[in-house]
Amino acid sequence: MKQLIFCLLLFSATAASAELPSATTSMVKQTLASGKPTVIDLGARTCIPCKKMAPILEGLTREYQGRANVLFIDVREDSAAGDRFKVRMIPTQIFFNAQGKEVNRHIGFMDKTGLIKELKAAGVK
């Protein structure tokens, strides 16, 4: 039984480390200047809806590699980002077109279908 608990703890620690890293200010600036549509998810690793979105965002990062950017910012680690993007609740997803202009914003959990719809509206082909 102890081995099973240890394995489960080890697996959960490994799964947690697979999450998207929290983007820095310089990463955000670089990404928005990349010429690709971008979604930035502002949340926290401790927020339940944010945790549910993490695997969706990771999947979109792989699925849209080279066509769109997917970033995550933990506003509990980087509260200045929450202020800079005027986040009132988490999670908040902000969509930017290829020119780096904000084109839409959503507050709350967003499923994969909704994220893809908004990325396409932002210009992803």
PLM features per residue range, with description:
Residues 35-38, 42-46, 89:
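Short pre-active-site segment immediately N-terminal to redox-active cysteine/selenocysteine motifs
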Residues 86-94:
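Structural micro-motif
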Residues 4-12:
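Sec-dependent N-terminal signal peptides
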Residues 61, 66-79:
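Thiol-based oxidoreductase modules, predominantly thioredoxin-like and allied folds used
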Residues 98-125:
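Non-catalytic, surface beta->alpha helical segment in thiol-disulfide oxidoreductase systems
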Residues 51-63:
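Typically the conserved alpha-helix immediately C-terminal to a functionally engaged Cys/Sec
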Residues 20-37:
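A short beta-strand-turn-helix
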